[in-house]
């Protein structure tokens, strides 16, 4: 009888060990940050001081999803760690608008060397405001759809975006169309894998109409708002979001999330937005 129990126990342990060999876990630390990167003439701080610090701090993260990397990219990228891979979004200066800037999107990766990264840049087809409504039409805002393939040949997707600002009805109408653009693109690509969508959506958490847009967007793509019940310092307006969806092959579990309060100098924060972070346990 004892021998029979021993054999059953040994078999059970062996099965579990065999199963665990096929489950790989990885913790990813993700930064989402609008860097306030307008040209110096439009801001009242010192971007030449701020951006090298922000660039260095991206080395603390596996994935950094950056918005407003407009006028200070040279200072910003000068302090990336040597192994970082980075991809900028759609650039400006076209024949139709030679003085327009690019999307300001930059995604930075410090992932395992054997992982693959593919980036698809897309510009929004609408904007609101040339001389009013936050002047969004002077930037080719858009989004990046990033396909990440792990060493086990399993995929998950990340979207980095910066949407139309401003509080007018026309600004909100543009945001609605931009959200629909993301939904359409995700569906067109038939993305059924795990999905992370993050960035400056310019959807104010205290604006009921903006929140209706966010809820519809979440429902359309089956997303969960990671920061819904996480308190951020009251000095910030909540415009930035991290939304996730589980996949069939990869499971995303939240380890921790919040504001990285180290993004400051002795005088002030490094931007006019909070630095949001998310630690994810990825099981494949």
Sequence positions of predicted segments:
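Catalytic metal-binding/acid-base residues of hydrolase active sites
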Residues: 36, 70, 162-164, 201-204, ...
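Short, solvent-exposed loop/turn segments at secondary-structure boundaries
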Residues: 42-46, 133-134, 169-174
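Sec-exported extracytoplasmic/periplasmic mature domains
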Residues: 59, 77-85, 113, 184-191, ...
């Amino acid at each position: 009888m004892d021998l029979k129990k021993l054999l059953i126990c040994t078999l059970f342990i062996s099965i579990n060990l065999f199963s665990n060999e096929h489950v790989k876990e990885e913790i990813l630390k993700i930064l989402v940050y609008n860097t306030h990167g307008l040209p110096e003439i439009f801001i009242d701080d010192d971007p030449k001081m701020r951006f090298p610090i922000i660039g260095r701090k991206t080395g603390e993260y596996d994935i950094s999803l950056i918005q407003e990397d407009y006028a200070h990219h040279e200072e910003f990228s000068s302090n990336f760690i040597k192994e970082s891979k980075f991809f900028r979004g759609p650039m400006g200066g076209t024949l139709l608008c030679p003085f327009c800037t690019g999307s300001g999107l930059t995604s930075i990766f410090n992932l395992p060397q054997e992982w693959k990264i593919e980036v698809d840049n897309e510009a929004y087809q609408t904007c609101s405001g040339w001389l009013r409504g936050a002047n969004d039409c002077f930037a080719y805002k858009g989004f990046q759809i990033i396909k990440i393939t792990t060493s086990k040949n399993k995929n998950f997707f990340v979207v980095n975006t910066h949407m139309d600002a401003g509080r007018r009805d026309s600004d909100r109408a543009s945001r609605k169309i931009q959200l629909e653009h993301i939904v359409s693109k995700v569906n067109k690509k038939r993305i059924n894998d795990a999905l992370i969508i993050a960035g400056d959506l310019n959807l104010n958490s205290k604006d009921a109409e903006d929140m209706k847009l966010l809820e519809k967007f979440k429902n359309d793509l089956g997303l969960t708002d990671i920061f819904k019940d996480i308190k951020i310092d009251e000095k910030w307006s909540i415009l930035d979001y991290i939304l996730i969806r589980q996949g069939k092959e990869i499971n995303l579990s939240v380890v921790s999330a919040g504001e990285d309060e180290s993004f400051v100098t002795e005088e002030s924060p490094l931007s006019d937005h909070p630095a949001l972070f998310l630690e994810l346990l990825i099981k494949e």
